[in-house]
Each structure stands twice: as structure tokens, then as C-alpha cells.
Amino acid sequence: MGFGWLLIGEMLLFPITVGFFYTVPVAAVFLCLAGYRLARVNRPFGVSFYLALLAGVLAVPAIVLRVIPATDGLAHYAEGATLLCIFAWHLAALTGMAWVTKETGLVKLHAVAYRNRIFCCIYFALAAFLTVADGLPVSEEAGRFLTGANYAVIALGLVVLALNAYLTFRAYANICMPEDVEMPRPASHFRFIKQ
């Protein structure tokens, strides 16, 4: 259905919590595949396709600017723009997830999707702010504060992305397209276990 691609793309986004943007273009490919497959389910998944495409495109200059030593200051702004695009993708994907879980009657997953949207808002706002602030000239004391805040945001990011991956896995396990016919369960080779 597309939730498998979504799960792979979500797992590839884990390194962005520590500022490692090199996996974002690869994750964007999987997220685009998921958005394309899930676009027929509801509109927010269609929007997530375009946002994943934009995130993949924005990640390339962020990577290039990070590699070139003279442009390290500009890399923070490119990474901030990439984070905002990934944030918008998360909002669209989680909205689509909330809609589809409501339609299928999965009340707990519906509540989890809305809870994850709130956590994503908090995490990505802090991460984008700290990514841009990291490139600014600050005093030594402010630099120590930003370093400590970065560690807290990294921990929060790992929790948020793990919660989103869990939600995606649960949706993958519980939701299928209406035209999909459930396959009959194959006979067990160990009949004595079922008896």
C-alpha cells in the first residue's frame, strides 16, 4: 500500500537528529514512493509526495555546502530550510495517517497520529532554530548553552522519529487497500502445534 516505503524513509531520517543530512536524498526517494502510492488514499499523502521531493532537492545544497569548508556558515541555513521542509512533510504525512486511521476505525492510532504531530512541531521548531543558531557567532557561554540544548534536541528527535516509525509500522500492519484480498493462511507443516 505504501506504508512499507514510508517506514523505510522514516528510518533513513534518523541521522538528521545529529546533523547528518547525507541520508536525506535517499530517504526522499522512499518517501516519494510512499507519497505516490498513498496519494490515492487521501490528499495529505499527495502533498507529502511533493514535500519529500522538495526535501530531497534542498538536502543536496546542504550537503554540498557542508563539504566545502569556506561555505560552512551557509550550510546551516540550507540545513534549516531542509529541516523545515521535512517538518512540513511530517505534518502532511501524519495528517494523512490520522485521516486514514479514522476512516478505518483505528481509534488508538488516530490519537497517536495527532499526538505525534504535536511532538513533531516541538522538535522541528527547536531543531531548525538550533541549526541556524549554530552558525551564528555567539559568546563562549552561549555556545556552551547551545551545545547542551543540541544534546537535548537530539534526544527529543530520536524519540519523535521512533514514535513516528512505530506509528507507521502499526499502520503498515493494520491497514490495507479495500481491493486487496486477504491471502488464505498456508497450512502449517507442524500440525501438532495447532492441535
Where are these regions (language model features)?
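Membrane-helix boundary/juxtamembrane motif in polytopic membrane proteins
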Residues: 98-129, 171-193
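N-terminal topogenic module of multi-pass integral membrane proteins
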Residues: 1-37
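Membrane-interface helix-boundary motifs at transmembrane edges
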Residues: 36-49, 70-73, 101-112
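Juxtamembrane "helix-exit" motif on the non-cytosolic side of transmembrane helices
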Residues: 63-74, 130-142
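Hydrophobic alpha-helical membrane segments
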Residues: 85-94, 112-135, 150-160
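Membrane-interfacial loop-to-transmembrane alpha-helix junctions, especially the N-terminal start
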Residues: 1-4, 41-53, 113-119
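Generic alpha-helical transmembrane segments
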Residues: 25-28, 58-62, 80-96, 157-161
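Non-cytosolic membrane-interface motifs at loop->transmembrane helix junctions
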Residues: 72-83, 143-153
